[in-house]
């Protein structure tokens, strides 16, 4: 049987369903349910397996199945698993009223499901009954899901109640409250999150740090920079992600000063996890502005020899990027790092057949900033060999900077 990690990557619904139904380990069944909830296409048999798992002997598996069905927005299936019917009315507010009533159910699973669906529906008027439920609910699993729902409804009026949940509550409730505060992004929410960035729990610090990245202001930057020195690699990486996110969202008049502050502090850390996180954002990020900022930063915080080669390799692979700014930032980043390693890496782009004309042109540009005699000689040959006007233009310009004949 493949590992759960492998199944998560492959999205093998059949194998996940088999684990959910037949594994003797509740941790495996729970994780299988979570993975099914995250799939783009869980298929009908995956949904049905989650419905069946709502009757699992283990409470954590039942809760995971409820969350997974909510993640898939499979409200009909969710209610079927609880022997309930979805309200016939097509109006969202009418459905919401019915689920608010379910918050009073004696069955914890139904209260969990009700909270989840209310978060999914996002009806503002349900924030008040959810907040009331959070203050009176005794079941930890239900409390956690109510806190989550309040964040998804995004009503600032509930900020104070969520801040109160950051302290003196079970960890799962505290983390859901922290994540919800990141959605609200009020001043009170910010103050609350800043109060737990040094929490004893690694998981709590990581959640708080991640939530701070949602604020479109420079205020969390100092706290996030401090977390670059956290003892936990996961917290440090979350801090990098949040700093990039803030940098991508702050007003332009604050951007330059912030960049310099963040670069100075990241460079001082010389931490491999920072480089790894930046490369991950570049490789896997879905937002262009995040990838641009991470590329720009990578060349300026490359650090010592332990991390420098990873940064050089990542930037080299971006020289032919379709986005002109990313390609430009990659070239200037390599120039910022400088040295023989960068020159050798750039010459490989010019000398092999693995790279397209755009990458070769940007490599020639960068060689004009970091190259020596061997680069000048290779660029002079490139001028004669290439059929690309852009490559020739970049090579000519680089040769002139290196003191060669043009």
Swiss-Prot record:
Keywords: Chemotaxis, Repeat. HEAT repeats lie at residues 7-41, 42-78, 90-127, 153-184, 185-215, 216-252, 370-406. Pfam families: HEAT_2 (PF13646). InterPro entries: ARM-like, ARM-type_fold, Armadillo, PBS_lyase_HEAT. GO terms for biological process: chemotaxis. One of its GO terms (molecular function) is oxidoreductase activity. Disruption phenotype: Mutants are unable to switch the direction of flagellar rotation. Flagella rotate only clockwise, resulting in exclusively forward swimming cells that are unable to respond to tactic signals. The keyword Magnesium does not apply. Involved in taxis signal transduction. Essential for the ability to control the direction of flagellar rotation. May have a role between CheY and the flagellum. Interacts with chemotaxis (Che) proteins. This is HEAT repeat-containing taxis protein OE_2401F. It comes from Halobacterium salinarum (strain ATCC 29341 / DSM 671 / R1). The lineage of its organism: Archaea, Methanobacteriati, Methanobacteriota, Stenosarchaea group, Halobacteria.
């Amino acid at each position: 049987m493949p590992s759960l990690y492998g199944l998560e990557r492959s999205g093998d619904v059949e194998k996940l369903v088999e684990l959910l139904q037949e594994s003797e380990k509740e941790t495996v069944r729970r994780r299988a349910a979570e993975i099914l909830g995250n799939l783009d296409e869980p298929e009908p048999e995956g949904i049905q397996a989650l419905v069946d798992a709502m009757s699992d002997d283990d409470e954590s598996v039942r809760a995971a199945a409820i969350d997974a069905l909510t993640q898939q927005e499979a409200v009909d299936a969710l209610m079927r698993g609880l022997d309930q019917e979805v309200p016939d009315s097509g109006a969202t507010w009418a459905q919401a009223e019915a689920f608010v009533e379910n918050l009073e159910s004696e069955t914890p699973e139904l209260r969990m499901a009700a909270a989840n669906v209310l978060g999914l529906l996002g009806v503002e008027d349900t924030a008040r009954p959810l907040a009331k439920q959070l203050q009176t609910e005794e079941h930890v699993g239900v409390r956690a899901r109510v806190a989550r729902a309040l964040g998804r409804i995004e009503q600032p009026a509930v900020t104070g109640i969520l801040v109160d949940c950051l302290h003196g509550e079970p960890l799962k409730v505290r983390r859901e409250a922290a994540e919800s505060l990141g959605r609200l992004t009020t001043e009170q929410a910010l103050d609350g999150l800043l109060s737990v960035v040094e929490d004893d729990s690694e998981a709590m610090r990581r959640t708080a740090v991640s939530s701070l990245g949602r604020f479109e202001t420079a205020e969390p930057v100092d706290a996030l920079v401090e977390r670059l020195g956290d003892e936990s690699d996961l917290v440090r990486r979350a801090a990098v992600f949040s700093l990039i996110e803030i940098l991508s969202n702050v007003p332009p008049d604050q951007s330059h000063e912030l960049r310099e502050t963040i670069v100075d502090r990241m460079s001082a850390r010389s931490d491999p996890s920072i480089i790894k996180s930046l490369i991950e954002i570049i490789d896997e990020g879905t937002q262009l502005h995040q990838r641009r900022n991470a590329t720009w930063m990578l060349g300026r915080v490359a650090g010592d020899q332990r991390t420098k080669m990873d940064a050089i390799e990542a930037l080299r692979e971006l020289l032919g990027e379709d986005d002109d700014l990313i390609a430009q930032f990659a070239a200037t980043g390599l120039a910022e790092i400088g040295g023989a390693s960068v020159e050798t890496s750039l010459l490989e782009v010019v000398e092999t057949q693995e790279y397209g004309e755009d990458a070769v042109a940007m490599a020639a540009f960068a060689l004009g900033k970091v190259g020596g005699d061997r680069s000048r000689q290779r660029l002079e040959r490139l001028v004669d060999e290439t059929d690309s006007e852009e490559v020739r233009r970049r090579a000519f310009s680089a040769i002139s900077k290196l003191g060669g004949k043009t």
